A protein has these predicted regions:
Chain A
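Substrate-binding rim/cap in mid-to-C-terminal beta-strand-loop elements of soluble/periplasmic
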Residues: 173-212
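Glycine-rich, phosphate-binding/catalytic loops in enzymes
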Residues: 20-26, 138-141, 176-179
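A long, amphipathic alpha-helix that forms part
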Residues: 100-116, 120-122, 127-162, 200-202, ...
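Structured loops at beta-to-helix junctions and adjacent beta-edge loops in soluble globular domains
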Residues: 54, 123-125, 186-188
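Metal-dependent active-site segment of extracytoplasmic phospho-/sulfohydrolases and closely related
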Residues: 3-13, 23, 141-173, 183, ...
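Active-site-proximal alpha/beta segments of enzymes that process anionic O-linked groups
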Residues: 2-3, 10-116, 198-215
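Short, solvent-exposed loop/turn segments at secondary-structure junctions
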Residues: 10-13, 82-86, 125-129, 167-169, ...
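Histidine-centered active-site/metal-ligand motif
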Residues: 129-133, 166-177
Length: 215, 135
């Protein structure tokens, strides 16, 4: 299997405990872990462009496949929220029209299938789409994601970066989230005692692809 | 005159006792106090039992522990709960030999009496704190 970069917009470590998750807490004890730092306001498109461009940027090219990270890694894209509807092999509208179960299952299914042939960059947007206005379903959303990550690992993915570009939604406004997201990966970071910046996630995935494929 | 008075050890003891009485009277409403060099000493001295969560922004398990501390602050209103960012206040962390994060330190009458390192289930932390409560 080829390396994968999977971003889950709007999840936080705190809810691993609150929702008594099974897979993600165990995973973070096995591989490298860190905290993604992204100050308010945090928007999905701007956050993802920073990752794809591997630098803090306001540059938003019209075609995500031309972004430096995509060109360097030749990664396939799945459900990337730089545009609405999302960009890639699987795509949804950034509203509540697609249920969180459907999105998570389809992204993970496409990921496992595609990672057999190429590196993959994928996103899950469900927490961001559903938790701004409805915290009561939080642990249901987290449980579906947790289980899906389990099937991803069982599906043979062994080189990965799982992250959230920002933490959980705080209140109804689109750009309001907790400022700290998750980073769980099979590639070690050079500065362990520092938070992970968005542009570094792109660079780390480039390094992961290079080290895994020897390119 | 005011300066002379503040150097009086008897007066300091009296003020400290009074502050404790006030703190006892005011129930903790479940909030976790953000601590720094200007309020740390007062915080640990004015609570019979105080619990301090030493954390840092880069520490993933620290974020996992946070909801447990918040929950305990609600369930144990007679205990003072605070958190200290060790990146912003390294001197305080060094003073208490905090080597790993997260570290939860339990203070009784201002002195450290116990500590728990890492993320542990709420029940374990609660039992450790309860051991230092008088009633």
């Amino acid at each position: 299997m080829y390396p994968i970069l999977l971003g889950i917009n709007g999840i936080s470590y705190g809810s691993f405990t609150e929702c008594e998750l099974n897979v993600l807490p165990r995973l973070m004890n096995i591989v490298d872990r860190g905290v993604v730092e992204n100050k308010k306001p945090q928007y999905p498109d701007k956050s993802w462009w920073t990752i794809l461009n591997m630098e803090p940027t306001n540059n938003t090219p019209s075609d995500p496949s031309l972004a430096p990270l995509v060109k360097l890694t030749r990664a396939a894209l799945i459900n990337i929220p730089v545009v609405n509807p999302t960009y890639g092999l699987y795509s949804i509208k950034l509203d509540q029209g697609t249920s969180y179960e459907e999105e998570v299952n389809n992204v993970i299914g496409a990921l496992i299938k595609t990672a057999a042939k190429a590196p993959v960059i994928a996103a899950i947007t469900a927490p961001d789409r559903f938790l701004h206005n409805n915290q009561s379903i939080k642990c249901n959303v987290y449980s579906v994601i947790d289980e899906a990550i389990g099937s991803l690992i069982n599906g043979g993915v062994s080189a990965f970066i799982l992250f959230s570009p920002y933490g959980e939604p705080v209140g109804p406004n689109e750009g309001d989230h907790e400022e700290y997201g998750i980073y769980i990966a099979t590639i070690s970071r050079p500065r362990h005692y520092d938070t992970v910046k968005l542009y570094e996630i792109g660079m780390l995935f480039r390094d992961l692809v290079e080290s895994t494929l020897g390119v | 005159m005011a300066n002379d008075a503040s150097k009086d050890p008897e007066l300091d003891k009296l003020l400290e006792r009074k502050a404790k009485e006030i703190a006892k009277g005011v129930k903790n409403t479940g909030n976790v106090v953000e601590l720094n060099h200007s309020n740390f000493n007062d915080f640990i001295k004015t609570h019979d039992v105080a619990v301090v969560d030493f954390w840092a922004t880069w520490c993933a398990p620290c974020f996992m522990l946070e909801p447990i501390i918040k929950r305990l602050a609600v369930e144990m209103p007679n205990v003072g709960f605070g958190r200290l960012n060790t990146e912003e206040e390294p001197e305080i962390a060094a003073k208490y030999y905090v080597m790993s994060l997260p570290t939860v330190m339990i203070f009784k009458n201002g002195d450290p009496v116990d500590q728990v390192v890492g993320v542990v289930p709420k029940k374990i932390l609660q039992d450790r704190i309860k051991a230092y409560l008088n009633d």
